[in-house]
C-alpha cells in the first residue's frame, strides 16, 4: 500500500564509493569515514574480499568483519550485506566490489554459446547486487580497485615513473549509482569524481 510522508534528512543514507589503485589507502579511509558517520566502531562492519586486509586496522577500534571466504558471487555479497543489516550495523563497508565484477567476467567467459546473448545471464545478477546496495537502509561505503598504469613525472630535474590509477574495475557507469565517488591517489590525495549536490536551506 502506498503512502505519502514529509521528507526528513534522517531518511537519507549515503552510498559512497572510494576508488584507487593498490596502496592508496581505500580501506583505511573507508574506516575513518565510517567512524565519522556513526562515532561507534561497534556499528561498523567491513565485508572483506581482500584476504583479511580489513583486520590490518584493528588498532583503530573494534569494528566488525565479515569474510567472503573466496566466494565473490553477487549472491554472497548480497547475503553479507543482509547479515550486517540484520545485526544492526549503521555503516557497511564493502571492500571491495571489484572482486564481484571479476567473478562475473570470469563467469561470462566460461559460458557456452553467443557471447553477447550470454550477458543476459550476467546482468541481472549484477543489477541485483547494485540494487541491494542502493536500497539498503544503512550507509554503505564501497571500495573499487582501479586499473594501474605508469606516467613519467619530473622530480628534482629527473623524469621519474609514477604509478597512477585509471578506470575503476567495475561495470561501466557504476560510478553514477553512488551519492559520492572519491578517487584516492598514491599520495593519499582525494578528488571528488561524482557528487550529488545537496543545497543547504
Predicted regions and their residues:
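Conserved P-loop
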Residues: 8-87, 91, 98-99
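Beta-strand-loop-alpha "switch" segments that mediate conformational coupling across diverse proteins
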Residues: 184-189
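Short active-site-adjacent structural elements
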Residues: 55, 190-193
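P-loop NTPase motor core
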Residues: 91-172
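Residue-level detector of conserved catalytic or cofactor/ligand-binding positions
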Residues: 194-201
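Pre-Walker A adenine-sensing motif
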Residues: 1-9
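Short, well-ordered beta-strand core segments
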Residues: 140, 179-183
Amino acid at each position: 500500500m502506498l503512502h505519502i510522508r514529509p521528507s526528513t534528512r534522517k531518511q537519507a543514507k549515503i552510498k559512497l564509493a572510494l576508488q584507487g589503485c593498490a596502496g592508496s589507502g581505500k580501506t583505511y579511509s573507508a574506516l575513518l569515514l565510517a567512524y565519522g558517520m556513526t562515532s561507534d566502531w561497534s556499528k561498523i562492519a567491513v565485508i572483506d574480499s581482500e584476504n583479511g586486509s580489513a583486520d590490518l586496522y584493528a588498532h583503530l577500534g573494534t569494528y566488525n568483519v565479515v569474510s567472503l571466504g573466496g566466494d565473490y558471487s553477487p549472491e554472497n555479497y548480497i547475503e553479507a550485506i543482509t547479515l550486517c543489516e540484520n545485526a544492526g550495523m549503521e555503516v557497511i563497508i564493502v571492500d571491495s566490489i571489484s572482486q564481484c565484477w571479476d567473478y562475473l567476467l570470469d563467469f561470462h567467459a566460461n559460458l557456452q554459446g553467443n557471447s553477447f546473448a550470454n550477458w543476459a545471464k550476467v546482468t541481472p545478477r549484477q543489477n541485483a547486487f547494485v540494487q541491494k546496495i542502493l536500497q539498503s537502509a544503512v550507509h554503505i561505503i564501497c571500495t573499487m580497485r582501479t586499473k594501474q598504469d605508469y606516467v613519467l613525472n619530473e622530480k628534482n630535474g629527473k623524469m621519474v615513473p609514477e604509478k597512477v590509477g585509471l578506470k575503476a574495475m567495475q561495470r561501466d557507469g557504476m560510478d553514477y549509482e553512488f551519492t559520492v565517488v572519491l578517487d584516492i591517489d598514491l599520495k593519499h590525495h582525494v578528488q571528488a569524481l561524482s557528487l550529488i549536490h545537496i543545497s543547504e536551506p
